[in-house]
Amino acid sequence: MKLLKWGFIGCGEVTEKKSGPAFNEIEGSKVIAVMSRNEKKARSYAERHKISKWYTDAQELIDDPDVNAIYIATPPSSHATYAIMAMRAGKPVYVEKPLAANYDDCVRINRVSEQTGIPCFVAYYRRYLPYFKRVKAKLLVR
């Protein structure tokens, strides 16, 4: 199995407590670089999580030859920009919901994914939580 070597764009609460921790807990996946525009935040996050590389520029993280997949956990207004940058660099993208801030940006992301053949996935991790499974089961009964 090829190791997914993730670069995180964004070092906020989602990467700390929600989706982020799982990236190092599953087989074949490791976070190797993080990026925040705030240098102190990027450095602190990397140190606390024993990640060797940190950046303040998204393009530098995307261009890192050791990073082979990108996770975007920033405000939705920046999702399209970062997702398109990563796909154009040939790197698969996993982006926090919502995919983008508006319909036009969603269309742009999908278009670039189709043009490049690089996948872009939305982090709908909650659909597998027990509560949501129960809701789904109740809805399917009707």
Language-model segment annotations:
Residues 100-142:
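A contiguous active-site-proximal alpha/beta segment in oxidoreductase catalytic domains
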Residues 22-26, 45-49, 84-89, 108-116, ...:
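Alpha-helical structural signal in soluble globular domains
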Residues 52-112:
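Beta-loop-alpha module in the N-terminal Rossmann-like domain of NAD(P)-dependent dehydrogenases
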Residues 1-49:
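N-terminal Rossmann-like dinucleotide-binding module
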Residues 32, 55, 94, 119-121:
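Structural detector of well-ordered beta-strand residues that form the stable sheet scaffold
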Residues 9-19, 62-70, 116-118:
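A broad helix-preferring feature
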Residues 18, 44, 60, 69, ...:
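Alpha-helical elements of Rossmann-like donor-binding domains used by nucleotide-donor carbohydrate transfer enzymes
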Residues 29, 68, 91, 118-119:
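Short, well-ordered coil/turn segments that N-cap beta-strands
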